[in-house]
């Protein structure tokens, strides 16, 4: 599922439904940094950039922050304390506007950081895909315990970030993956989700945008990555490239291995989070390389209120359960051939 949609209860329900209705083993992977949203247990804190933005803005506008509302560097903040801080800032800004000391049409932007559960951080993609692949390898090695065929089919279903991870798994270990059904995957690395977007433009690149009456709070996942070329954690072009699904040379190398059947659904109006133009370019490239691939671009006529609920933008509020009901049976009926001497290693240029 996507980063905003991951929910233990929901995914468990889907897994149980699939296991009960189809002859499959369902694998849910608690991969690295899977819980980096507030409703899933993540915490709010202010790093040095967040504090600098907050402090400098308040000083410029002569807004006094009471000691109990003043965040401490890298210290978790309870949700109630965060809401009190927001309320205080909105109240002060309203007063300034009433006194015509501030542009009444402008909303001020502040930032905050998101601490995932288990004290993890956003590595983005690579470690998460490796967690999934390690879990797959474990199940395949112990196939008898899971009542599977000796060479079981491996099918990946994903939504948004989960869809991206499904495609990344196939890039890293094509011999393991037979089929992918995904909705709304991004195929390039979104700067907003790497964690250091605030270093570049804190009003533009962020995980979460909370637009309130007088302020906009932009949340960023905790990350070690930085745009600083002198840092050992610099997010270099090579780090970007290995995570990029659309890289032309990498796709050519992938195509020389076992090719997964790839079925995608995407919203015609998804222009920011996962631009539909990039998904079209991806599928055009796959077709030229001999993949069995299909891209469904949802438009207004596809809205049925059940499977696809809207085409306003990213995700379409698609029913994952109905996606599985639609796409899983034909995949289970299909035979996937593997060469006896197929390569089980892959290397990509940086």
Kindly give the residue locations of the regions a language model identified.
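Gly/Ser-rich "nucleophile elbow"/oxyanion-hole loop immediately N-terminal to the catalytic nucleophile
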Residues: 46-88, 115-130, 137-155, 176
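Hydrophobic/aromatic beta-strand patches that form the interior of the parallel beta-sheet core
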Residues: 27-29, 155, 181-183, 263-265
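Long, low-complexity, polar/charged, intrinsically disordered or flexibly structured peripheral segments
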Residues: 86-115
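Serine-hydrolase catalytic core
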Residues: 205-350
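Residue-level signal for short, function-critical loop segments
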Residues: 2, 160, 268-269
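Short, surface-exposed "cap/lid" segments of acyl-processing enzymes
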Residues: 1-94
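Short, surface-exposed basic-aromatic patches at helix termini and helix-loop junctions that form
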Residues: 15-22, 144, 169-176, 255-256, ...
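Primarily recognizes the serine-hydrolase "nucleophile elbow" in alpha/beta-hydrolase
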Residues: 137-199
């Amino acid at each position: 599922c996507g980063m905003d949609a991951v929910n233990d209860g929901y995914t468990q329900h889907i897994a149980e439904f699939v296991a009960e209705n189809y002859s499959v083993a369902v694998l849910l992977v608690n991969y690295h940094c899977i819980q980096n949203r507030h409703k899933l247990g993540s915490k709010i804190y202010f790093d040095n950039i967040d504090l600098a933005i907050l402090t400098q803005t308040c000083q410029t506008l002569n807004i006094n922050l009471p000691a109990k509302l003043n965040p401490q560097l890298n210290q978790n903040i309870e949700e109630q304390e965060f809401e009190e801080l927001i309320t205080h800032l909105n109240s002060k800004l309203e007063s300034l506007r009433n006194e015509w000391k501030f542009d009444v049409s402008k909303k001020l932007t502040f930032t905050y950081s998101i601490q995932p559960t288990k004290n993890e951080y956003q590595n983005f993609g690579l470690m998460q895909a490796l967690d999934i692949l390690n879990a797959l390898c474990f199940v395949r090695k112990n196939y008898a315990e899971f009542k599977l065929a000796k060479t079981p089919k491996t099918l990946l279903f994903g939504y948004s970030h989960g869809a991206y991870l499904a495609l990344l798994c196939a890039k890293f270990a094509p011999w393991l993956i037979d089929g992918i059904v995904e909705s709304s995957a991004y195929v390039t690395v979104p700067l907003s989700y790497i964690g250091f977007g605030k270093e570049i433009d804190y009003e533009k690149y962020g995980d979460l945008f909370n637009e309130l009456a007088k302020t906009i709070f932009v949340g960023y996942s905790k990350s070690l990555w930085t745009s600083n070329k002198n840092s050992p954690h610099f997010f270099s072009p090579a780090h970007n490239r290995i995570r990029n699904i659309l890289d032309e040379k990498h796709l050519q190398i992938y195509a020389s291995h076992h090719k997964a059947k790839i079925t995608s659904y995407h919203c015609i109006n998804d222009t920011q989070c996962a631009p539909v133009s990039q998904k079209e370019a991806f599928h055009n490239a796959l077709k030229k390389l001999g993949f069995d691939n299909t891209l469904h671009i949802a438009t207004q006529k596809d809205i049925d209120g059940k499977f696809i609920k809207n085409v306003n933008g990213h995700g379409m509020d698609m029913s994952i359960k109905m996606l599985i009901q639609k796409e899983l049976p034909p995949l289970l009926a299909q035979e996937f051939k593997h060469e006896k001497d197929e390569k089980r290693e892959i290397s990509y240029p940086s």
